[in-house]
Each structure stands twice: as structure tokens, then as C-alpha cells.
Amino acid sequence: MVMKKVFWIILCMFFILPVIFAENMKLHYERPAEYFEEALVIGNGTMGATLYGGVKKDKISFNDITLWTGEPESENSSPDAFNAIPEIRALLDNEDYQGADKAQYKVQGHYSENYQPLGTLTIEYLDDTAGISDYHRWLDIGNATARTQYLKGGKLFTSDYFASAPDSVIVIRLKSENKEGIHALLSFDSPLPHSSQVADNEISVEGYAAYHSFPVYYKAEDKHRYDPERGIHFKTLVRVLSVDGSVKNRYSDSRIEIDGSTEVLIWVANVTSFNGFDKDPVKEGRNYRSHVEKRMKCAIGKTYDALREAHIRDYKYYFDRVKLDLGDTDDDIAALPTDK
């Protein structure tokens, strides 16, 4: 009888401990992010997003792993580099380290190219932000989902985010318990040369990265060189669905207006023309336009729950292979926000 009780206790602990462990896997904050370093980050291996969790204006900044400056190198940029090796060795033997450091530039090629940001989705809430309380935002590392939530006039508002690898899309869901719903403007901007248009509840953005750039420490007035006929190109799609309210396409400024919806779904997809390190991204680039349109079509054909479940299942297949035990933490300490 005693052994049976012990068995049931152990069995219960087996199911309870993962729940406790999962709760402790959250990065939790009680105010919106002000700087990049304070933002929460999600990604699917191709696209990444930083989440600021703003109340009046929420920003979600995106990048793409293939959005770099540069083009394929057609020749050896330093064919005579080997001639500098004896000089560098001699300078080192004479302990002339400054001279050796200067001489080693002769064996280097061009400056490496740089990563470039894709752009930022801004959700500007047009409602009065007075009466907001109980603000929380978190990233659950256990299932790679993030949330911002707070009370407004005693009614719960939530923003949920995840970056799906199976469906190659970033998904955002806004929900409000307020019967008047959500009233907001959505826009997408990029620091790169680009054009935007809106149609059928979708913002479409096309642009291109620099074909060459210098490091940030390089003294030059123009560190980035752009040409629409060169460099990696991209297309970003932002699709919006209002479950029970209205969606208006603002053609004049390429924005989307949401009004009176208690639930809004947003999908973000991006594809670049990168087709390999040795392929010209314009002349031999991938058909990024058709790829991103197909990707979006597939994603919006699935329910939010189906996308989320597939994402979590895929993520946990890899993440749950390892667990790190850092010991016990007092409950009052564990309840504190991460930055406290």
C-alpha cells in the first residue's frame, strides 16, 4: 500500500514538475521596451523579430538572415598578399607590433559586407490609453511564444507573437475584451530603399539592400552604396484579418486601419533574391516575389491554432532535448520581473 502511494506521488511529480519548469522559462517584464536591448526576440531560423510591447504605439522590427550588402566576388582581391608575409614576420621579430599591425592589412581582402535591417511594423492604437494597469510582457523560452498584456478600463488586452519555422511566417494576434474593440493603424517602414502599396488588406513592400558597404568604424561620408540594378532585393507582405470588425485600406499612405474588432490576426512573410554566395542576386536571383506570395497564401489558409500548434511542436522537438537545472529559487524571487 505504501509503495502504491509512493508510485502515485512520483507519477504526479512527473506531470507537475514540467509545468513548474515551464513557468520558470519566461523572461518577464512589467513595462514596455524602450531600447533594442530591452526588446524580446523571436525567430524561425530565417526571419527574426524584436518585440517592444508598446501600449500607445507598438513596434515589431524584422530582419532576414539573407538580407546582406554585397555581391559575389569575381576575382581574388589580394593576389599579391603572400609577399607581405615576410615583412610582417620581420616586424614581429623586431617587436614592432604597430608596424606589423599596419602591414597585415596588405594580406586582407575587401572589408566584409554587412547585415541590414528589413523594416518595422508599427501598430498605432488610436484609442485613449488612460486607465491602463497590470502591464506584463514575456517571452516563454519553453515554447518560443511571446505576449504583451494589460488591463484597460478593467478589460484585458493581449498581443501574442510567434515565429513559425514550419510555415516560414511570423504571426501576431491582438485580442481585446472591450466591446468597442480595437482601433489601430498598421504601417510598415524600412530604412532601405523601398516602395509600398496596400490592397486587399495586405501591405506589400519591395526594396533592396546596398550592393556594397563599409564597416561602421570606416571614415566615409557614404558607408552604403545603393543601386536598384544591384544588390539583394526583397519583398515583404503583411496580411491583416479582422475577425469581427472592419479593415480599411488607406491607399494614400499604404496603411491599414482596423476598427471595432475584438480579435485581429496579422501574418508577416518575407523572401529575398539571395540564391547562393556565388550567384548574382539580380541576374541569377531567386524569384522572391512568387515565393513570398505562395508562402503567405499557405499561411493564411490555416487557422491561428493550427499555425501555433505546428510551431510549438516543431520548436519543442529541438528545445526539449536538453534541460538545464540551476537549482531552487525562492517563490518570491521567482515572481519578480527578469530585470529586477
Show which residues each predicted segment covers.
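Aromatic-residue-lined binding/catalytic grooves and analogous aromatic/hydrophobic interfacial grooves
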Residues: 23-340
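Sec-dependent N-terminal signal peptides
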Residues: 6-17
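N-terminal secretory signal peptides that target proteins for export/translocation
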Residues: 1-4
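Sec/Tat signal peptide C-region and signal peptidase I cleavage site
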Residues: 18-22
